[in-house]
A protein has these predicted regions:
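Low-complexity, intrinsically disordered terminal/linker segments enriched in charged
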Residues: 157-198
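Bacterial N-terminal signal peptides that target proteins for export
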Residues: 1-9
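Sec/Tat signal peptide C-region and signal peptidase I cleavage site
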Residues: 17-23
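A mature extracytoplasmic/lumenal domain signature
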Residues: 92, 116-119, 130-133, 145-147, ...
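Short beta-strand edge/turn micro-motifs at domain boundaries
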Residues: 140-167
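Surface-exposed, charged secondary-structure patches
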Residues: 98-139, 187, 192-198
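Early exported N-terminus immediately downstream of N-terminal targeting peptides
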Residues: 25-100
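Bacterial N-terminal signal peptides
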Residues: 8-17
Length: 198
């Protein structure tokens, strides 16, 4: 009896060990994360502050803030010290929240179509989607993702109607750092977070 149980468990472990671990594709990953966001936005029982907090958590799951920041700064990333980078990451995230938070919360049940994956380079893919507005207009909304060391697909750029979030901010940061210092850039971001004009 005991011998049979041991053999059975051994076979089970062998089968489990031989089974391939399922990894979600980039499109599946984006669809799952976007649907989580939509679930929050459609929840009429949640107040705005509660929605913002839940969206903040989902943002951390969906995006890689350091990779996004690196791409937005481009070569200028190397101009920042480790301490400046550690301050830049949360500051920039707060700037993004202030800039796009209200727009996301204004979502009014538009339909989202998940179309295809387009390879960019090794380990990087663009997931192409379309937002169908209430006026029957199609808005291209693409997510650029990369596969991190743990094998998870994370967003590092969003392209809406051919306008890249990364390139938009890189242009702004290049202009600031061409004449100023990393500390001056951080001060500009601090003021943006506080809602002050720069």
């Amino acid at each position: 009896m005991m011998k049979g149980l041991v053999v059975g468990l051994s076979l089970l472990l062998l089968v489990m060990g031989a089974a391939p671990v399922y990894a979600a594709t980039p499109l599946e990953t984006v669809r799952t994360e976007v649907n989580k966001v939509l679930e929050v936005l459609r929840n009429k029982s949640l107040k705005e502050d509660a929605k913002r907090e839940k969206l903040r958590v989902l943002y951390a799951e969906m995006f890689d803030q350091e990779e996004l920041s690196r791409w937005c700064l481009g070569r200028n990333w190397n101009k920042l010290s480790e301490a400046q980078r550690q301050e830049f990451l949360p500051l920039f995230q707060q700037v993004l929240e202030k800039t796009y938070g209200d727009r996301i919360l204004s979502y009014s049940d538009e339909k989202i179509l998940f179309d295809r994956e387009v390879p960019i380079s090794k380990g990087r893919v663009e997931v192409q989607t379309r937002v169908m507005t209430t006026k029957s207009k199609e808005v291209p909304f693409n997510y650029r993702v990369f596969q991190n060391k743990s094998g998870t697909w994370k967003v590092y750029d969003v392209v809406v109607e051919n306008v890249s979030l990364v390139m938009n901010y890189r242009s702004q940061f290049n202009e600031i750092l061409a004449k100023g210092t990393p500390d001056e850039l951080l001060e500009i971001l601090r003021k943006k977070v506080k809602g002050q004009k720069t």
